[in-house]
């Protein structure tokens, strides 16, 4: 894959790992079979792997419990040109009133392609690119006022990568980065996509699983079910199950006593990670988190 064909994350996602992707890559096993990512979110590690020409991924399984997110991945993979047109239509109509109408339509829409188009439009026009739902599962993020830099909706390039005009409300301007969406479509061509609970994946001995759940004690409203302490305990038990079956796994989570206790049998390394979504750029800073593996990797420590 050439530099110009390198795909980048096409959604902004709370807890996204784009800045950490090189570090995560360095801690992956040298060899493995199939690749699984059951909390795909923005998919930063997957996109990083796609950009590494020395990595040859064979069977790739990306999944998440968030249905609109998986609709977006599937639409990019299977119907990217139609998706570009539909998102462009939403952008052309972009006003505060239209945003509120689109948000209401998104809550009841059942057509996968239109769900994907609305999802991507809302993801880039909402406040700080945050995806959040209430207990009824309805997207409830207000309209954004800042213009976020984005590989999907291009706000900063002097020469737009879009054949469609930008929409602007206040100082929020959004364009479709068609080039990146097409690169993403090519990268996703041979992937298996599923909307499912993390426990539904079926890796075999020697396969590799990267798990990036909503962190303990942090934002988890990606889905109406949330991700509470019991879900974290269930995930830790699932990782024990993976280990017993000879499946290689790497897991990211917040650095706290509970997480260290749940994963005591495994290797734990502390990382400093940038905060990608916060109320202001000043507040984004860094947070401590841990990287947990059930195999030896470079610079692993258990402080």
From Swiss-Prot:
The keyword Nucleus does not apply. It is an enzyme of class 2 (transferase). It holds the Pfam family MethyltransfD12. S-adenosyl-L-methionine binds at residues 13, 17, 64, 212. Keywords: DNA replication, Methyltransferase, S-adenosyl-L-methionine, Transferase. Its EC number is 2.1.1.72. It catalyses: a 2'-deoxyadenosine in DNA + S-adenosyl-L-methionine = an N(6)-methyl-2'-deoxyadenosine in DNA + S-adenosyl-L-homocysteine + H(+). Gene3D superfamilies: Adenine-specific Methyltransferase, Domain 2, Vaccinia Virus protein VP39. One of its GO terms (molecular function) is site-specific DNA-methyltransferase (adenine-specific) activity. One of its GO terms (biological process) is methylation. It comes from the Bacteria. The keyword Methyltransferase applies. NCBIfam families: dam. Belongs to the N(4)/N(6)-methyltransferase family. Directly involved in methyl-directed DNA mismatch repair, DNA replication, and gene expression. This is DNA adenine methylase. It comes from Treponema pallidum (strain Nichols). The gene is dam.
